[in-house]
Amino acid sequence: MSSAVLVTLLPDPSSSFREDAPRPPVPGEEGETPPCQPSVGKVQSTKPMPVSSNARRNEDGLGEPEGRASPDSPLTRWTKSLHSLLGDQDGAYLFRTFLEREKCVDTLDFWFACNGFRQMNLKDTKTLRVAKAIYKRYIENNSVVSKQLKPATKTYIRDGIKKQQIGSVMFDQAQTEIQAVMEENAYQVFLTSDIYLEYVRSGGENTAYMSNGGLGSLKVLCGYLPTLNEEEEWTCADLKCKLSPTVVGLSSKTLRATASVRSTETAENGFRSFKRSDPVNPYHVGSGYVFAPATSANDSELSSDALTDDSMSMTDSSVDGVPPYRMGSKKQLQREMHRSVKANGQVSLPHFPRTHRLPKEMTPVEPAAFAAELISRLEKLKLELESRHSLEERLQQIREDEEKEGSEQALSSRDGAPVQHPLALLPSGSYEEDPQTILDDHLSRVLKTPGCQSPGVGRYSPRSRSPDHHHQHHHHQQCHTLLPTGGKLPPVAACPLLGGKSFLTKQTTKHVHHHYIHHHAVPKTKEEIEAEATQRVRCLCPGGTDYYCYSKCKSHPKAPEPLPGEQFCGSRGGTLPKRNAKGTEPGLALSARDGGMSSAAGAPQLPGEEGDRSQDVWQWMLESERQSKSKPHSAQSIRKSYPLESACAAPGERVSRHHLLGASGHSRSVARAHPFTQDPAMPPLTPPNTLAQLEEACRRLAEVSKPQKQRCCVASQQRDRNHSAAGQAGASPFANPSLAPEDHKEPKKLASVHALQASELVVTYFFCGEEIPYRRMLKAQSLTLGHFKEQLSKKGNYRYYFKKASDEFACGAVFEEIWDDETVLPMYEGRILGKVERID
């Protein structure tokens, strides 16, 4: 057995008693190093107390017991203060070796340099050079010492050297600061470092390593072998180094001096008393490192009720020298085992180091397979990058096209060509005041005075046909056209806006805001703005096929004068009835209304670059018209609700709605319904505020009196007579312009009532056999059973029946039971009628 193993097996000499041993010390004066207890949890290894290698006698000659450290030994003094450590030569050298490993040895060198400078003679010429050298070496540059000094201290030293005011105490403040830093950090770490502990274990006897710098070669002489990597082979070099003559031998004096240290080491590294709080070698992290209670092994051995040699403890005296017939019963053995478990506590299982294994991703593969996988991943990445670049290029191209389009339209809107902008209905000064506010004020005055005309505007007088950009130059020119006595309508080419009746494309609608807000700056009077708002409420689209008339306006300077034989037509006074235009092409119908003055070939043409797109829009509008013919009821309801929508919707919504109708004219005389509600492919508009609509409708209905309703009926009869007379004569002037406001109020009222009914849902139900039903108005288009249950004030288990139309019975209706909360409730005659019955 090697000596390295014998170290751990030798008993503590201080624990044995010999007759020739000296008398033990007086209680309380044994020394600073108490005997170490090998019990778990009481061993403090952070600051092990040093052991003296020189057991000396006291002054009285009695002396200390051998194996005990002297209170004033060097190792003991080192732990008292930093001055004691640096005052000892071995301690200073050991501390310097530690600082070299920590790469902060400059702090100790600076401390000794300050001590040496304090002892120098100030009259000597070398003193100034030494001061400058200390300043340049440790303070001027960005070294460890300079970082730990205060700025004021460095400034004081620099000024003293520059002024050559050298004093023996000029470095005292800097030395004090560095000493304080070392006491707080380096000194505390040194007392728990391996260098100091190895020196303590060696007892400080062998000083050969001090000269050879062999502090790092001192290792623990007992315990587990060092961890060996998988790819390395262990050699006995370390063990031979430990047994070399430079290492502490196993003399009796050394064993007595290091008895307490070895007992502490045995307690720390022992098998039975392992400390669970000690950190594990990082190499063994996650390698099992667990404890197993002593009961687990003992109980597992007895689980099979087999009493074998393996299940009996051979380490204690429970079975040694005891005959088999005196061993006792099985219960006694179990009781003895449980008593042993309580006495011994937990058994720490030794951890078995696991070898290093490469992660799964780093397993070596064949070069060909690796290359194939790498190529596939790179190709996939390349495709993703190319698709991203192509998408970015397309988006950039779309942005450039839109910007180019916008710039071209801006240039075309500013030139002097007589091309009418499709949004010429909007007032040029509408941006100065909110159009919705103007419209509400005007409608309130019209409804208060139904028999009066709008200020300065005729019954069916649309705004000027001339482009707004000519108003900037000719706003002072106004023409008052008189009603001619007879004749026909002017040709199509005579009205530029009639030629622009065609279609609204994406390019034209996209430029609405820019054109009118930024290119029409001539303000208009409030009366003119109100007149134009009135026309928008009546849905008079200039350029329509049913209406064409002149009024007091700012005319285009280049517009042709009306012919002497030309005559104006009213809203119901077209050259042909509306039914005559059905089934014919727009060009033919227009030529028929013009009385043969213009043909289909003479119809205005769109620019070539927008022809295909405009044709698509026209086909879509024709398709919408055909669908509206097959649904007369829906078309009629939409036509009735349109005036109220025009009055309450936002200005931008009215503009888009008015232009998309194209050449349809007034909403009451249009066979084609509104395209937004007929074509599901169209994007839905922003819904108006229902509460605002209801409040406005109620206010207007309250202002209308019964005599006004009678006059509305008279006006409608008169209008019908005028319409029939106009269909026979071909053209006629207005029968009675004073009836214009009354004629306009009747459809507005009907549309308001219809919109009020369409926006609310009537729910009527009988609750648990009560005779009187409950009626509730909900602002919704449909209702599910779950929402219906939320409206009930009484909660419980009920059955729900709702009336629906059915051909199964003669009555034509049935009550259907609905139990799914997501099911939409059926409607009967435009409302929901249900019964709620309690489940017994």
Swiss-Prot record:
Residues 56-69 have a biased composition (Basic and acidic residues). Residues 42-55 have a biased composition (Polar residues). A motif (Tankyrase-binding motif) lies at residues 21-30. One of its GO terms (molecular function) is beta-catenin binding. PROSITE patterns: DIX, RGS. Residues 303-318 have a biased composition (Low complexity). Keywords: ADP-ribosylation, Cytoplasm, Phosphoprotein, Tumor suppressor, Ubl conjugation, Wnt signaling pathway. Residues 327-413 are annotated as: Interaction with GSK3B. Interacts with glycogen synthase kinase-3 beta (GSK3B) and beta-catenin. The interaction between axin and beta-catenin occurs via the armadillo repeats contained in beta-catenin. Interacts with SMAD7 and RNF111. Interacts with ANKRD6. Interacts with SIAH1. Interacts with SIAH2. This is Axin-2. It comes from Mus musculus.
